[in-house]
């Protein structure tokens, strides 16, 4: 039985149309473009020197590594990966080797120019990433290379630009020239614009008398500027401290965190006046709060005037010892009793807060001196209830004469005050002994020069103590000799 004949299937040309239709169908699968056109494609290969891009052309396009990014000397693998969809500009349809040469960065450049020009027209900011530090400034990737001069990076000149690498920042476009491929940016202009808006809103919400925290941003001869959070206010040198200072650096340094009070907000001039000392207790009020009339305090003679001597009793606090309060005897001039720089225990006889004056007495302090230590005279005033009973310190058990557990802080504070009062009594004792010795020496000299000297002349040596006190002190000195 003969085998069946196998015949190949026949396909008529008419099944796919005419030959013209066939060529047209093939033609539709091939993209046609010219130099300078922007095409889209898929990354199919990434090499060290180049990247291959499938754009549906008869051959794959080649993007040289230098045409991948506006950054210099980049690794292609850091820019693209296989499978990425990208745009590229046709540089050459066919080079000497017959390759289609493309540029990714040029495509970005062309697209970016349109965006940049539109932003410039609207006076809007552009956002980009800092990719390089060059001579004179920074290079930003804004789709093309934008130059940001160092003088326009911040409100103040920045010396070290390296920390900006990799940061995304906004800037205004101040110069644009496509023919020269020149784009100049200014972050300072953007900061001025945005900060002006923020400043206006901030100032509207800033009320006189409010307490704010800030950071010292700069120091000048006439004061210190404090950043309150985007807005700087001035603390005039007279508002930095209750005491006299010659320069702001005596009180604050750049970077210091401070608490200030708002003294004034000038909306028209957009200026804020601040005070540092207003947030601190007035030393005069502090002195008045912690000292009582009649208390004996240590001080140092700072100045002599015809009518008395000024004595500093605390930092920034000076009181006057009137010439009549220097000694029991008549004093012609203050330097007969004290000299500038002398330590002196003086008695507080008046505090005038309104006039900021303190009256002191050296004479009364010495009259009140007793060898027996009385803490109340030196700052530890006794407290009594309405029935006249002594009020013991908090945490002290009067029955056992012991401090209770849990009151260690109160005990430490009380003992510190007691120790300070005791120290002052010792200073007072030393002062009395010193002048007793001086009086004794002065009287001995007078006895040798004139046996008939008048009593007033016998005291010409400058005693600071009464006769009774001097007698008691002479006995003490004689007993310890």
UniProtKB/Swiss-Prot annotation:
Q: Could you confirm whether the keyword ATP-binding appears in this record? A: no
Q: Which domain of life is it from?
A: Bacteria
Enumerate composition-biased segments (Low complexity).
437-456
Effect listed in the UniProt record for changing residue 310 to G: 3-fold decrease in binding of POA, decreased binding of tmRNA (expressed as residues 285-481)
Instruction: Give the note.
Output: Mutations in this gene that alter POA binding may cause antibiotic resistance.
What is the protein's name according to its record?
A: Small ribosomal subunit protein bS1
* Domain S1 motif: residue ranges: 36-105, 123-188, 209-277, 294-363
The record's family statement is: Belongs to the bacterial ribosomal protein bS1 family.
The record's section on SUPFAM superfamilies has: Nucleic acid-binding proteins (SSF50249)
Please state what the annotation says regarding this protein's domains.
Full-length S1 protein and the C-terminal domain (residues 285-481) bind tmRNA; the interaction is disrupted in a concentration-dependent manner by POA. 2 POA molecules bind to the C-terminal domain (residues 285-481) and S1 motif 4 (residues 285-368).
Question: Which Pfam families did the record assign?
Answer: S1
GO CC annotation, single:
peptidoglycan-based cell wall
| A Gene Ontology BP annotation from the UniProt entry | translation
Q: Which GO molecular function annotation, any one, does this entry have?
A: structural constituent of ribosome
Q: What is the effect of changing residue 303 to A?
A: 2.5-fold decrease in binding of POA, decreased binding of tmRNA (expressed as residues 285-481)
Ribosomal protein recorded as keyword: yes
The annotated region (Disordered) lies at: 429-467
Query: Keywords on this record?
Result: Repeat, Ribonucleoprotein, Ribosomal protein, RNA-binding
Q: Briefly, what is this protein's role?
A: Binds mRNA, facilitating recognition of most mRNAs by the 30S ribosomal subunit during translation initiation. Probably plays a role in trans-translation; binds tmRNA (the product of the ssrA gene). In trans-translation Ala-aminoacylated transfer-messenger RNA (tmRNA, product of the ssrA gene; the 2 termini fold to resemble tRNA(Ala) while it encodes a short internal open reading frame (the tag peptide)) acts like a tRNA, entering the A-site of the ribosome and displacing the stalled mRNA (which is subsequently degraded).
